[in-house]
């Protein structure tokens, strides 16, 4: 192990890690928004939109992120829509992640007993109040494990961003291996930085799950 090489290129990996984290978090934020909207449409069985959401989820979950990125990065400019690599990365992650988040949120919503909704309506609550105060708090706490797993999954999926020339962690490792043939050192740094990004999320997710399990409605 060449520690001099590792120390020399540590700042390069740090810069790549910030890029990976920035694009990853932006993509995840949009994925959460898309997922919540889609799960709500499915939960309330909105005509037409429900079918569109179902098609989107199947399309997103059954095609690789790399293919989706290539379509956005190379396909959209052919249709006159100009974009850049970072925007494509965010859009691709949001498109893929939205379907996974939708399924996670939907499972949480469907876990709530219908009697709770009926009881809320009988107390004079409208649909918004029922969702805001009765259904959503329980559904969110139930969805925590799947939500955290999806966040980690999506951050790991950022490793394909190098295919569209984004200088992320994977791009940096491949670049250094190609230039200096320092495979062990380059991959060691890659693993270390992915652990730095992902381990805190995993630990915080476990703590959050224990703290909010069923939001006090169950063990």
Regions found by a protein language model. Give the residues of each.
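Transmembrane alpha-helices and adjacent helix-loop boundaries
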Residues: 1-219
């Amino acid at each position: 192990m060449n520690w001099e090489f590792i120390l020399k290129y540590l700042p390069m990996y740090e810069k790549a890690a910030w890029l990976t984290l920035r694009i990853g978090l932006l993509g995840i934020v949009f994925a959460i928004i898309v997922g919540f909207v889609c799960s709500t449409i499915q939960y309330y069985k909105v005509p037409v939109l429900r079918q569109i959401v179902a098609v989107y989820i199947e399309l997103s979950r059954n095609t690789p992120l790399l293919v989706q990125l290539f379509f956005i990065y190379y396909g959209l400019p052919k249709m006159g829509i100009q974009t850049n690599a970072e925007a494509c990365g965010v859009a691709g992650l949001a498109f893929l992640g939205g379907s996974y988040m939708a399924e996670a949120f939907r499972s949480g919503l469907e876990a709530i007993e219908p009697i709770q909704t009926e009881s809320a309506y009988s107390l004079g609550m409208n649909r918004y109040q029922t969702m805001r105060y009765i259904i959503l708090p329980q559904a969110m706490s139930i969805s925590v494990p799947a939500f955290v797993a999806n966040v980690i999954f999506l951050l790991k999926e950022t490793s394909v961003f190098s295919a569209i020339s984004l200088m992320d962690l994977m791009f940096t490792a491949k670049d250094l291996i190609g230039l200096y043939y320092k495979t062990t050192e380059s991959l060691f740094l890659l693993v270390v930085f992915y652990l730095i990004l992902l381990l805190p999320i995993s630990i915080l997710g476990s703590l959050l799950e224990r703290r909010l399990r069923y939001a006090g409605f169950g063990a």
